[in-house]
Amino acid sequence: MGNAYIFSLQPTFTQGLILGQFSILFLLVLVLKYLFFDTVSDHAYRTSSYQPKIERDEDEDGIALVAERLAPKPAQDGKQSGNECESADWLNALLIQVLEAYRVKLRDGLPGAEGDEVARKRVERFANQMRPPGFLDPIKVHSVDLGVTAPRLSRARPRPQKAPNTDPAIEFDMSYADTISLSLSTSVLFNYPFASFARLPVSLTISLSHFSSSVLLTPPQPHAQHPTVTLNLPSPGTDFVLNIQTKSLMGSRAKLADVPKLHEMITHQIQRVLLEKGTWKVVLPGLASVSEVKEDVKREQQAGELPVN
């Protein structure tokens, strides 16, 4: 008679080890799913009962004073503060009016809470147009602060030409401190092991503390086929300082507040966007069209002269 396989109800060490691993994994899934994740399928625009806020030490007037302190002071007695450097005060006055015009336009010219609501809806609509639908639930914007000041430019100076045939350019130092902030909530979707397996609710407030950088302004080339004014932020070969505040809340029943890794990720993404998309070309009326300049930019990107945006 051949050897028969005898099944024993007494578990072996290997069976116990495998069963223990599955038990731990099962408990971990339960804890994550029912404490931190949200399993409700109809979650569109569902918000947390708490939206984190940035606690500021300064009010709007205080922020304006901070911006004033951060900006270099103009030279006394009509003297320039450095070799061939100008204060650019006239440009700062123009920049303040330009930004204020955009703020009024975003609010449809409405004051107070009514204008705030118009700006909030516009930012929310733009955010949902840009969000990846398979990764994030619809984004709910709770509040938007468009700020009260403008970047402060100083020390306008010619940029030294590294080669005889390089284009002349003007370099500025820029410093910006304002009340700009954005408060929103959404959910991160988990599509494993099946679609919409779970949702991780996230409430987030992002606020600008201080941003400083150099700015390079390149005038148009008179003999170029499509002359444009080029603005680089930051100036090539230089660094910049970006300080932002974040307040976050993650989870459904059990909540994690102010996760450091989330702050690092947001800061890194903003820095990456500034480096990749920090070049703007201003089309001169009557000398070129936007479509022609876009074709020029594509050719420059293919030739490796510009970063791909």
UniProtKB/Swiss-Prot annotation:
InterPro entries: Mmm1 (IPR027537), MMM1_dom (IPR019411), SMP_LBD (IPR031468)
Pfam family, one: MMM1
Annotated GO MF terms: lipid binding
Residues of the SMP-LTD domain: 84-293
Similarity field: Belongs to the MMM1 family.
Compartments (UniProt record): Endoplasmic reticulum membrane
Main location: endoplasmic reticulum
Cytoplasmic side: 38-309
GO biological process terms held by the UniProt record: mitochondrial genome maintenance; mitochondrion-endoplasmic reticulum membrane tethering; phospholipid transport; protein insertion into mitochondrial outer membrane
Protein name, per record: Maintenance of mitochondrial morphology protein 1
